[in-house]
Amino acid sequence: MASSTALSLSWSSSPCWSHSFNGGANETLKVSERRFNFEVVSQKKAKKLRKVILKEDVTDLGKQGQLLDVKAGFFRNFLLPTGKAQLMTPLLLKELKMEDERIEAEKQRVKEEAQQLAMVFQTVGAFKVKRKGGKGKLIFGSVTAQDLVDIIKSQLQKDIDKRLVSLPEIRETGEYIAELKLHPDVTARVKINVFAN
């Protein structure tokens, strides 16, 4: 049924259309019951796109390592001569997938280590901090994130960056809770008991 014969219609010679303009309410439009199958063929030029991977960040285009479809002329005249992109080949695509899998495995390993460290902090209980006492419950100075990091290092032999520690302001004796942001998905809560000497 897929014959590609061209069919041309002339409106004046076609018996299937009948229209009368009498200038009143009796205008009619008659169409015969025959159905025509038309095949429209366009002479539009197809856009030529190239799959490329960016070697560095390109303004208004993408980031390094991103896989994009760009126009062939843009790739040939700008991206290739400046060394900002490389044409995607099956071998390069395979290497890219392997690199993505390696990065994903590394992220998973880091997350698991953070979860294990959070479990260690839950089992330890409270860390004890002694400060010189003042009037009532007040202490001289305050307990800082660096103090907590030093205590964790001395008791658990774990190095924690002090920028990961979120502490309330501690200027009195009592029990406090600090949060350690070990990973974007893992937060550990640590109890701190502050005593006066």
UniProtKB/Swiss-Prot annotation:
Which cell locations does it reside in?
Plastid, Chloroplast
InterPro entries from the UniProt entry? Ribosomal_bL9, Ribosomal_bL9/RNase_H1_N, Ribosomal_bL9_bac/chp, Ribosomal_bL9_C, Ribosomal_bL9_C_sf, Ribosomal_bL9_N, Ribosomal_bL9_N_sf
Q: SUPFAM superfamilies attached here?
A: L9 N-domain-like, Ribosomal protein L9 C-domain
Molecular function via GO: mRNA binding; rRNA binding; structural constituent of ribosome
Primary subcellular site in the record, as a coarse category: plastid
RNA-binding: present as a keyword of the record?
yes
Cross-referenced PROSITE patterns: RIBOSOMAL_L9 (PS00651)
- Transit pept. (range): 1-42
> Which key words are in the record?
Chloroplast, Plastid, Ribonucleoprotein, Ribosomal protein, RNA-binding, rRNA-binding, Transit peptide
Record's GO cellular component terms = chloroplast; chloroplast envelope; chloroplast stroma; cytosol; plastid large ribosomal subunit
Please provide an example of a Pfam family that matches this protein in its UniProt record.
Ribosomal_L9_C
Task: Name the GO terms of the biological process aspect.
Answer: translation
**Function of this protein?**
Binds to the 23S rRNA.
Instruction: State whether it acts alone or in a complex, and with which partners, per the record.
Output: Part of the 50S ribosomal subunit.
**Protein family:** Belongs to the bacterial ribosomal protein bL9 family.
Q: What is this protein called?
A: Large ribosomal subunit protein bL9c
User: Which organism does this sequence originate in?
Assistant: Arabidopsis thaliana (Mouse-ear cress)
